[in-house]
Amino acid sequence: MAGTTAEYISHHLSFLASGDGFWAVHLDTLFFSLLAGVIFLFVFSRVAKNATSGVPGKLQCFVEIVIGWVDGLVKDNFHGPRNVIAPLALTIFCWVFIMNAIDLVPVDFLPQLANMFGIHYLRAVPTADISAPLGMSICVFFLILFYTVKSKGFGGLVKEYTLHPFNHWVFIPVNFILETVTLLAKPISLAFRLFGNMYAGELIFILIAVMYMADNFALQALGIPLHLVWAIFHILVITLQAFIFMMLTIVYLSIAYNKADH
């Protein structure tokens, strides 16, 4: 049983990869990330195309509520032009939420479906792969630099990382180290927070699924309510993690854009 369990868990934690080592490309992560993006674009474009000024349908009402909610958050936290930040925040929240929500699909369903087509390894949750959250966080990192330069200019960027917090040339090396660590900590923490929570959630689903393989009928039966309870709780987790990623992105960009005020 132990060996079977270990192999089962290892199989579910293996990627469909092209290449080896650092340069390996996780094809399953790419596919499901793109699929989540396509779902988001399809739903929102369909609502926009069929939008009516009369009595809206349920889907249009839901989309309008989400858009209004995100726009309100951006308005309250980003004190600058919202024409780019609001759509960016909306895209981040919806995209991350959809990628997270794939975790609610039974752990064996998609791998077994893929196995019918000769695909022996498949991990369906992109945000449980560090490469996806890290890729998004790197984009946020460059946006932070962009909005810092846009707000203060390139010279202001240099001053920010050499004359802050100690405004004296003697402390330039110290300031540079402190500010660089602070800057790099933002995308790293952003990525690992999302990855850690989603990886843990995926692993718990796998461990619950292992219970169905037990020889003890009582243990098998216990897996059903545990799976249901964890799935219900996980709905909160996937929503909260999407919100946190979006909210921290807004806050980081707001700080970068308004550094002249500090």
Swiss-Prot record:
Q: Which residues cross the membrane?
A: 24-44, 84-104, 129-149, 165-185, 194-214, 228-248
Q: How does it sit in the membrane?
A: Multi-pass membrane protein
The record, for PROSITE patterns, names: ATPASE_A
Question: Which UniProt keywords are listed?
Answer: ATP synthesis, Cell inner membrane, Cell membrane, CF(0), Hydrogen ion transport, Ion transport, Membrane, Transmembrane, Transmembrane helix, Transport
Q: Record keywords: Lyase included?
A: no
SUPFAM superfamilies referenced in this protein's UniProt entry, alphabetically: F1F0 ATP synthase subunit A (SSF81336)
Q: Which GO terms describe its biological process?
A: proton motive force-driven plasma membrane ATP synthesis
- Membership in a protein family: Belongs to the ATPase A chain family.
Which PANTHER family does the protein's record reference? ATP SYNTHASE SUBUNIT A, CHLOROPLASTIC
Name listed for the protein in its UniProt record: ATP synthase subunit a
Q: Which organism is it from?
A: Actinobacillus pleuropneumoniae serotype 5b (strain L20)
User: Could you tell me the gene encoding this protein?
Assistant: atpB
